[in-house]
């Protein structure tokens, strides 16, 4: 004989369903940007983590063409010392 145990009751979520995720959208497509500039540091900082890593497109919702431009712009800004490679070590 198989033992199935007690049946678990279904939970009713009063808040949002944790499995439902909001659809991400590309900021650059919405703004009509044609090319990402390496001198626009405020925009570039939004796509870099505190430890210096570039945030992947699957988390930001950026389209592939803009993610490649963003990657190049961040690397170019790092090379020119406009952005740090890593976080500040205290």
Curated annotation (Swiss-Prot):
Supply one GO BP term: translation
List, alphabetically, the Pfam families matched.
Answer: Ribosomal_S18
Q: Give the coiled coil ranges.
A: none
Q: Which UniProt keywords apply?
A: Ribonucleoprotein, Ribosomal protein, RNA-binding, rRNA-binding
Q: Which GO terms describe its molecular function?
A: small ribosomal subunit rRNA binding; structural constituent of ribosome
> In the UniProt record, does the keyword Magnesium occur?
no
Q: Which GO CC terms are listed, alphabetically?
A: cytosolic small ribosomal subunit
- Organism superkingdom: Bacteria
Function recorded in the entry:
Binds as a heterodimer with protein bS6 to the central domain of the 16S rRNA, where it helps stabilize the platform of the 30S subunit.
Entry-linked NCBIfam families: S18 (TIGR00165)
Q: Which family does it belong to?
A: Belongs to the bacterial ribosomal protein bS18 family.
Quaternary structure per UniProt?
Part of the 30S ribosomal subunit. Forms a tight heterodimer with protein bS6.
Q: Which PANTHER family did the record assign?
A: 30S RIBOSOMAL PROTEIN S18 (PTHR13479), SMALL RIBOSOMAL SUBUNIT PROTEIN BS18M (PTHR13479:SF40)
- Full protein name: Small ribosomal subunit protein bS18
Q: What does the organism's lineage look like at the top?
A: Bacteria, Pseudomonadati, Pseudomonadota, Betaproteobacteria, Burkholderiales
The gene from which this protein is expressed is rpsR
